[in-house]
Amino acid sequence: MNEDLPKEYFELIRKALNEKEAEKAPLSRRRRVRRKNQPLPDAKKKFKTGLNELPRESVVTVNLDSSDDGVVTVPTDDSVEEIQSSEEDYDSEEFEDVTDGNEVAGVEDISVEIKPSSKRNSDARRTSRNVCSNEERKRRKYFHMLYLVCLMVHGFIRNEWINSKRLSRKLSNLVPEKVFELLHPQKDEELPLRSTRKLLDGLKKCMELWQKHWKITKKYDNVGLYMRTWKEIEMSANNKRKFKTLKRSDFLRAVSKGHGDPDISVQGFVAMLRACNVNARLIMSCQPPDFTNMKIDTSLNGNNAYKDMVKYPIFWCEVWDKFSKKWITVDPVNLKTIEQVRLHSKLAPKGVACCERNMLRYVIAYDRKYGCRDVTRRYAQWMNSKVRKRRITKDDFGEKWFRKVITALHHRKRTKIDDYEDQYFFQRDESEGIPDSVQDLKNHPYYVLEQDIKQTQIVKPGCKECGYLKVHGKVGKVLKVYAKRDIADLKSARQWYMNGRILKTGSRCKKVIKRTVGRPKGEAEEEDERLYSFEDTELYIPPLASASGEITKNTFGNIEVFAPTMIPGNCCLVENPVAIKAARFLGVEFAPAVTSFKFERGSTVKPVLSGIVVAKWLREAIETAIDGIEFIQEDDNRKEHLLGALESWNTLLLKLRIRSKLNSTYGKIAEEEPNVTKEQNIADNHDNTETFMGGGFLPGIANHEARPYSEPSEPEDSLDYVSVDKAEESATDDDVGEDYSDFMKELEMSEESD
């Protein structure tokens, strides 16, 4: 090595070599320090016991619920002290000796068991377990609809009962002449409010008279018509006790005598007003179970008292004021109040305890002419933002269904009173205003947040926001609110064509969006798609058919009919599966009609040909040909079914012939009779419930006792209910063949006659 190098270089090289050797050397463990009083173990004794005994397994339990992080307890037989690390340990000269490979045999097996924390996810598990499944949600929704129909029909029946003429004659005697005059005041031309005031005084007098006449002698059975929880409904389904139904005669007797529960009392009060020729209608607040409650455990608290439940009524009354053109609300039993509802009604339930059993969602009105109307808008202050979300009418399917139910129960023509009431409901919708929370603005029928405007929507030109919403908890954050009438829907040119409209000449797109093209993964690409508004389109008018009936077709040889306006003016659409076959049979001009598209797996799209487009003067001929083709198809199906039945009969007769021949030639094989006790009991049970007519290949006798089939004891093969005389018993194989040939001849003759 060069001696000219300074000493510092040699020291650096020596230090680097020492560090490499230290890295290659095996790591040594620190010596375990034992207690002073504990004697050293005998090496020989330990070696002997190690050969005779298997190593014991040590268990290490790690509990994640423990608050001491990083501390693990290892229970072993040897007591070992844990030495805290300090600077003195590094200065100590005592090191642990490296164990040889032969000493590894004494090492014990250690199994580590980790227990997950149960407290950490306990709350999350409770919430996840208390949410019902999708199937349960559907079941609750349809049960809610069924329950609602039953309640509405119940109110309709009670409204029919209180129109009894016999009951009206009895109740009219309760009202004196002075009160009757107050119920029918003359119109005050100077101040119509005076006439309304007299009507209100007459209603107040009627309430006082009815309170003297009626005595509430009975409480509600369980919860009555108030809302039940899902758990209570399941328990009542398992309960098989019979409920006593109230008959019409019992109802009329209770109203005449003035004894019963509060619901019958209100219904009797409406009957008394109708007996006085007052336009009064029965109001019912239907309380079906809440289908928006997604919890599995829907049990209520035990603190719910009977007084909280009956604080707000289920039934009340409305009287028409012909002077102010409004309905007056009357509650003669519970709250004993008379009001003209403006924004908030006194009959709307308030408080958590009252709303658990009485939730204002469906308020149905029944008038004296058997009319049925939904008047929930009058009593619900926040109808569109809060109440609507708990109704079945929150989506289009439920809205259509509810209208059908109302229409089925509405048995009168429309009057001017309905027009006044609809105008009042429209004013209430306008005066409800913008909700004060983001949650209430979700799916609102009249307002939408700026952040909820869809990609295919824009704000109409010249329209601005109608209000602002300040977000709670976020300083300075304000959201814009737009009216839905100021939002325009945009569609592409193809989408407008599917609706029977095409773009105007020179129209410009209102918006350009990115559309994903290509269904398979990895092949999706984005391309620009131009969107147009309704004002940029016009109605598509197809060309007319020629005098010979020829129709203009596209390149595929058909015509697209996605809307009724896409049919040529002198043509018609005939939708039938065999319409194309009928037109080809007649040899007339036609065009297959593509009315929709069918999407299959992947990106495959196939057109649906549901009929044809022909000239109007050929419609009758096409329909006649379709009827003939359908008749031929039905006749072919009938013949095919008949041939199948005849083949089955033929197979049965062949089997009987072969069996009879084998028995007559080789004799009958003895078989054990089956155990008929169990089958006889089953047949008796079926015979007790209903009787069956004979069917199948072998005709039976009506009301005949069912018996299991058993082999006859005679050498000949016969059936129990078929009488066989002695002449037939001596029949030979030739006789059987002649009978079969005669049967086949008759069969061929019947086919020729057909």
From Swiss-Prot:
<comment type="function">
    <text>Involved in nucleotide excision repair of DNA damaged with UV light, bulky adducts, or cross-linking agents.</text>
</comment>
<dbReference type="GO" id="GO:0005829">
    <property type="term" value="C:cytosol"/>
</dbReference>
<keyword id="KW-0227">DNA damage</keyword>
<dbReference type="GO" id="GO:0006289">
    <property type="term" value="P:nucleotide-excision repair"/>
</dbReference>
<dbReference type="GO" id="GO:0005737">
    <property type="term" value="C:cytoplasm"/>
</dbReference>
<dbReference type="InterPro" id="IPR018326">
    <property type="entry name" value="Rad4_beta-hairpin_dom1"/>
</dbReference>
<dbReference type="InterPro" id="IPR018327">
    <property type="entry name" value="BHD_2"/>
</dbReference>
<dbReference type="GO" id="GO:0005634">
    <property type="term" value="C:nucleus"/>
</dbReference>
<dbReference type="InterPro" id="IPR004583">
    <property type="entry name" value="DNA_repair_Rad4"/>
</dbReference>
<dbReference type="GO" id="GO:0043161">
    <property type="term" value="P:proteasome-mediated ubiquitin-dependent protein catabolic process"/>
</dbReference>
<dbReference type="InterPro" id="IPR036985">
    <property type="entry name" value="Transglutaminase-like_sf"/>
</dbReference>
<keyword id="KW-0539">Nucleus</keyword>
<dbReference type="InterPro" id="IPR018026">
    <property type="entry name" value="DNA_repair_Rad4-like"/>
</dbReference>
<keyword id="KW-0234">DNA repair</keyword>
<feature type="region of interest" description="Disordered">
    <location>
        <begin position="23"/>
        <end position="51"/>
    </location>
</feature>
<dbReference type="GO" id="GO:0003697">
    <property type="term" value="F:single-stranded DNA binding"/>
</dbReference>
<dbReference type="Pfam" id="PF10403">
    <property type="entry name" value="BHD_1"/>
</dbReference>
<dbReference type="GO" id="GO:0003684">
    <property type="term" value="F:damaged DNA binding"/>
</dbReference>
<feature type="compositionally biased region" description="Basic residues">
    <location>
        <begin position="27"/>
        <end position="37"/>
    </location>
</feature>
<keyword id="KW-0963">Cytoplasm</keyword>
<dbReference type="GO" id="GO:1990165">
    <property type="term" value="F:single-strand break-containing DNA binding"/>
</dbReference>
<dbReference type="InterPro" id="IPR042488">
    <property type="entry name" value="Rad4_BHD3_sf"/>
</dbReference>
<dbReference type="InterPro" id="IPR038765">
    <property type="entry name" value="Papain-like_cys_pep_sf"/>
</dbReference>
<dbReference type="GO" id="GO:0000715">
    <property type="term" value="P:nucleotide-excision repair, DNA damage recognition"/>
</dbReference>
<dbReference type="Pfam" id="PF03835">
    <property type="entry name" value="Rad4"/>
</dbReference>
<comment type="similarity">
    <text>Belongs to the XPC family.</text>
</comment>
<keyword id="KW-0238">DNA-binding</keyword>
<dbReference type="InterPro" id="IPR018328">
    <property type="entry name" value="Rad4_beta-hairpin_dom3"/>
</dbReference>
<feature type="DNA-binding region">
    <location>
        <begin position="250"/>
        <end position="269"/>
    </location>
</feature>
<dbReference type="Pfam" id="PF10405">
    <property type="entry name" value="BHD_3"/>
</dbReference>
<dbReference type="GO" id="GO:0000122">
    <property type="term" value="P:negative regulation of transcription by RNA polymerase II"/>
</dbReference>
<dbReference type="GO" id="GO:0000111">
    <property type="term" value="C:nucleotide-excision repair factor 2 complex"/>
</dbReference>
<dbReference type="InterPro" id="IPR018325">
    <property type="entry name" value="Rad4/PNGase_transGLS-fold"/>
</dbReference>
<feature type="compositionally biased region" description="Acidic residues">
    <location>
        <begin position="730"/>
        <end position="741"/>
    </location>
</feature>
<feature type="region of interest" description="Disordered">
    <location>
        <begin position="701"/>
        <end position="754"/>
    </location>
</feature>
<protein>
    <recommendedName>
        <fullName>DNA repair protein RAD4</fullName>
    </recommendedName>
</protein>
<dbReference type="GO" id="GO:0006298">
    <property type="term" value="P:mismatch repair"/>
</dbReference>
<dbReference type="GO" id="GO:0006265">
    <property type="term" value="P:DNA topological change"/>
</dbReference>
<dbReference type="GO" id="GO:0071942">
    <property type="term" value="C:XPC complex"/>
</dbReference>
